[in-house]
Amino acid sequence: MEYLFIQFAGFTFGKSASAYATPWQGFPGNISSNLLGGQNTDTGTNNIQYTAQFGNGVSATIGLDDPTVWDRTNVYNLIPSLALNATLGGNNAYAGTHAPDVVGNIRVDQAWGLFQISAAAHEVNASYNSLGLSGLPAVAVTSGSPGGASEPSGHPDSRWGGAVMAALQIKNLPTGAGDDIKVDASYAKGATKMVIATSGTSPSFAMFGGTSVAGAYQSIGFGATTDAVYLPVANGGDGSLHLTEAFGIRGAFNHNWNPYWSSSLYGSYSAVRYDGTAKAFICANYTTPSKAVSADYICNPDFNVSQLGLVTRWTPVKNLAFSAEVQWFHLDQMFQGTALLGPSGPKPTTRYEFKDQDTIQLQVRVQRNF
């Protein structure tokens, strides 16, 4: 069940859209659920919120969201024994939830359109420096369950991150009745789910393609989505959480050709950035001698994602719609050179070129509302 809540006297209790979200969530014009660039809680999140109405379409909402399921990505512990895999994936070292996300918005919703400013505060907390049954804190082991050496090894201090978003909808366009433009822009630090968001959990990326480099089997591009990374002092780090930054923008122009046909042109741009210390820790973990990297190899975990799509809908009768969507997806990764990698099967362990990747997806949907 997506939404289940009760409302009275301005309060909302239950599973509903976050107070941070826009009315269109992650769907300014698209039908696919993977348009990045901002937050999306269209399947609902457990929350408590209060809305004050000031008249003339002006309102303010403040709420508490449960971040456990939908508002967290990953925290990487970069000790050498927890090695990042071939596509920069790591073991998630997020600790348990200590505090809810504090979220809110100020909204103006009038005949001309809508304007909204949202903000969120999100706590990032990590598990122990070492997970294992025995040994000193400096001896990192790969067990995924806390053991006798875990608590004495300590853990990074929790840090608070957050996000802000500005959203705009313009109605009554001269292009036709019911046409509108929707756009929102977001920035997050330690709350990457507010930018790299889908209807499910935040994705990390691993894509393969062709190559023209001699000796390389294929090309590979990847991007790791995290809220923070850390390297314990006992393993040569500073023991602190380094919060990941992300920013994005997405929007759509929605046009009605006639009462039965409509189209939406939409797009987005998203970026994930690691600070200099985080990059050094990630690259030290990833760039092992076994990868036999090329002379022109550069390690940089930052990445960007661009999306552009078109949807056309036919509504022959009320509450019945046939839709077709085509979307281009571009992954702009920052690694360079080649390396000997062992991705998961069926891909072989061999030499790959680091390269940007593209794909196109087609989606067809029939929707009947009752």
Predicted regions and their residues:
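Transmembrane beta-barrel outer-membrane domains
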Residues: 1, 39-43, 95-99, 155-163, ...
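Outer membrane beta-barrel
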Residues: 1-83, 96-114, 170-172, 185-187, ...
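Hydrophobic, lipid-facing positions within transmembrane beta-strands of outer-membrane proteins
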Residues: 2-4, 44-48, 100-104, 162-166, ...
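Outer-membrane beta-barrel proteins
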Residues: 10-11, 22-26, 51-56, 69-74, 103-112, 126-129, 166-178, 191-196, ...
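Transmembrane beta-strands of outer-membrane beta-barrel proteins
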Residues: 11-13, 60-62, 104, 113-117, ...
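Detector for outer-membrane/organellar transmembrane beta-barrel domains
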Residues: 116-308
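Outer-membrane beta-barrel "beta-signal"
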Residues: 356-370
